[in-house]
Amino acid sequence: MARFNAFITERLLLSACDGLLKLGARRKDIAVVRVPGAFEIPSAARTLALTGKYDAIICLGCLLRGGTAHYDVIVNEVTRGIGQSAQETGVPHAFGVLTCDTLEQAIDRAGLKMGNKGFEAALAAVEMATLKQVVSRQSSVSKKKQIPRSARNGKDARKKRR
């Protein structure tokens, strides 16, 4: 979670934790890591994912548009970095980074009017972690049921044709 714009990100964090607990997570299994700002989120997410200790990573932050191009650069890099980390590590990453034009929009998305994006990110993280586990189990079961290559089209099959 990014500390920058903490008034917003702390609300996102509380709702994300609430969502995880409601879905059956144990408090002791929820790790919270704080980073200075949104730009640091992808690096921290990748570092955590590479440990192999986490089923999913929930990335929380808040970016507010200012009067310069800085916002656009940071939004693009954070988004790209989170997606890249998820693809490279194979660990699901939920995107809970608000990208808002105004503080009012951020407040709304942090729970006052439009739901809470932290809670939504927690739901997405659990759904994707569950999907990964299901696919992994199905894959390991189907590998056990496969016919050995030699019996399908290898040496044994060629000998019988001659």
PLM segments and residue spans:
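Intrinsic disorder/low-complexity segments
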Residues: 133-162
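A charged, well-structured terminal subsegment
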Residues: 115-137
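Active-site nucleophile and cofactor-binding loops and adjacent substrate-binding regions
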Residues: 32-37, 73-75, 113
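Phosphate-binding/catalytic loops
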Residues: 101-115
